[in-house]
């Protein structure tokens, strides 16, 4: 079960965080529990979604000035 969890964690880190192998291995070595890991992933996604929304809002605001 623990080994499955490690593989699951690696898979999600590779899929959701497009980062190089060294960073992935350092995150895997943190030995987070499932709860902590899920909280971290949710936090990362909230930040990504907020930054995306903010970026799009800024683009539309800037485009609005030129209309």
UniProtKB/Swiss-Prot annotation:
It is a multi-pass membrane protein. InterPro entries: Phage_1-C74_Orf10 (IPR021217). The keyword Membrane applies. Its main location: host cell. GO terms for cellular component: host cell membrane; membrane. Keywords: Host membrane, Membrane, Transmembrane, Transmembrane helix. Pfam families: DUF2649. The keyword Zinc-finger does not apply. The chain crosses the membrane at residues 10-30, 40-60. It is found in: Host membrane. Belongs to the plectrovirus ORF10 family. This is Uncharacterized protein ORF10.
